[in-house]
């Protein structure tokens, strides 16, 4: 692992151009905050890379557990940051809008911690099985493990279709495994164990007990925090039964939005909806004097339905 050099951060400039090309108001808040935190730690590292990376030797044997928190937020150089954050940008836009901002923030925090723990377990196991203590000294840093976990979630929610990896079409459900192997052979300096740890954490969420454990912990926290005006109920397909309340206490339930989803999406996939929304935002900027609505601005349901149907009828 090399220490980054000072100079023009071309990767950082490209990342900023990507963000402004999409539009800050089109990026959900937790995704945007995750990008901002990673960029801030890149420009103002909490500790040098050698003191923030994770390894069995440093974390387990020397009890330096704070590295589990620091390692996902530090990157080797501006290109390492760029590729990770561009990937985070597109995964975050899709997943945060599906899961909701609070749950997505919970997922990011949990995955950031667990990928480090699983990485240490993998390195320790390999070192013991092969009798190679050098594996205990391998030090990893970066957000890519979390991204592989999010990749598993994205493929779980959108299992159909193919992606092109090194010129070969690969089904979405196997894409993370193909990328794991491809990155390892094309870029030998990357952490194979770190990426594998991310995949395993993602599978623990989609196929294992992790999501139920997170649901239970969230329920305990909410019960201790007391009643609130909003309740979120989650299942394996994301949020359902989102409930809000009027000022007089009457509940407003949005289950019908999910049952009549095609009315709002015109039958488009998530990727097509995202592309159309970005194009519409760009068109609105060029043809109106008013700026785009901030993220999270909510129209009344009937007004939203009227505007969307009017837009689709005009195309």
From Swiss-Prot:
The chain crosses the membrane at residues 22-42, 104-124, 138-154, 181-201. Residues 269-284 are annotated as: Ubiquitin-binding domain (UBD). Residues 301-315 are annotated as: VCP/p97-interacting motif (VIM). It is a multi-pass membrane protein. Its EC number is 3.4.21.105. Changing residue 274 to A: Inhibits interaction with ubiquitin and ubiquitinated proteins. Reduces the cleavage of PTCRA. InterPro entries: Peptidase_S54_rhomboid_dom, Rhomboid-like_sf. Inhibited by aprotinin. Residues 43-103, 155-180 are lumenal. GO terms for biological process: apoptotic process; cellular response to unfolded protein; cellular response to UV; ERAD pathway; membrane protein intracellular domain proteolysis; membrane protein proteolysis; membrane protein proteolysis involved in retrograde protein transport, ER to cytosol; negative regulation of apoptotic process. Its main location: endoplasmic reticulum. Expressed in testis (at protein level). Expressed in intestine, lung, brain, kidney, epididymis, stomach, muscle, spleen, liver, heart and testis. GO terms for molecular function: endopeptidase activity; peptidase activity; serine-type endopeptidase activity. One of its GO terms (cellular component) is endoplasmic reticulum membrane. It is found in: Endoplasmic reticulum membrane; Mitochondrion membrane. Residues 1-21, 125-137, 202-315 are cytoplasmic. Pfam families: Rhomboid. It catalyses: Cleaves type-1 transmembrane domains using a catalytic dyad composed of serine and histidine that are contributed by different transmembrane domains. The active site is at residues 144, 195. Intramembrane-cleaving serine protease that cleaves single transmembrane or multi-pass membrane proteins in the hydrophobic plane of the membrane, luminal loops and juxtamembrane regions. Involved in regulated intramembrane proteolysis and the subsequent release of functional polypeptides from their membrane anchors. Functional component of endoplasmic reticulum-associated degradation (ERAD) for misfolded membrane proteins. Required for the degradation process of some specific misfolded endoplasmic reticulum (ER) luminal proteins. Belongs to the peptidase S54 family. PANTHER family: RHOMBOID-RELATED PROTEIN, RHOMBOID-RELATED PROTEIN 4. Interacts with BIK and STEAP3. Interacts (via C-terminal domain) with VCP/P97. Interacts with ubiquitin and ubiquitinated proteins. This is Rhomboid-related protein 4. It comes from Mus musculus. The gene is Rhbdd1.
């Amino acid at each position: 692992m090399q220490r980054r050099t000072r100079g023009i951060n071309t990767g950082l400039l490209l990342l900023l151009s990507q963000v402004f090309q999409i539009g800050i108001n089109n990026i959900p808040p937790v995704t945007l905050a995750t990008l901002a935190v990673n960029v801030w730690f890149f420009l103002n590292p909490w500790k040098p890379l050698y003191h923030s990376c994770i390894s069995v030797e440093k974390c387990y044997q020397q009890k330096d557990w704070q590295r589990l928190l620091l390692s996902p937020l530090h990157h080797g150089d501006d290109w390492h940051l760029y590729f990770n954050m561009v990937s985070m940008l597109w995964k975050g836009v899709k997943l945060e809008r599906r899961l909701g901002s609070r749950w997505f923030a919970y997922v990011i925090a949990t995955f950031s911690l667990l990928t480090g723990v699983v990485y240490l377990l993998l390195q320790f196991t390999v070192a013991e099985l092969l009798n190679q203590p050098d594996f205990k000294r391998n030090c990893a840093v970066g957000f890519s493990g979390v991204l592989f976990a999010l990749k598993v979630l994205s493929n779980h929610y959108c299992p159909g279709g193919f992606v092109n990896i090194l010129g070969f079409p690969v089904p979405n459900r196997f894409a993370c495994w193909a990328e794991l192997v491809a990155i390892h052979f094309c870029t030998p300096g990357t952490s194979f164990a770190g990426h594998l740890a991310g995949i395993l954490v993602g599978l623990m969420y989609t196929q294992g007990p992790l999501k139920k454990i997170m649901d239970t912990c969230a329920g305990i926290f909410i019960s201790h925090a007391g009643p609130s005006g909003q309740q979120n109920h989650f299942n394996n397909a994301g949020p359902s039964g989102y409930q809000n309340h009027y000022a007089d206490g009457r509940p407003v339930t949005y289950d019908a939005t999910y049952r009549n989803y095609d009315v709002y999406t015109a039958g488009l996939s998530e990727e097509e909806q995202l592309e159309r929304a970005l194009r519409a935002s760009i068109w609105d900027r060029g043809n109106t004097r008013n700026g785009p609505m901030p993220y999270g601005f909510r129209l009344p349901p009937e007004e939203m339905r009227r505007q969307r149907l009017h837009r689709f009828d005009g195309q």
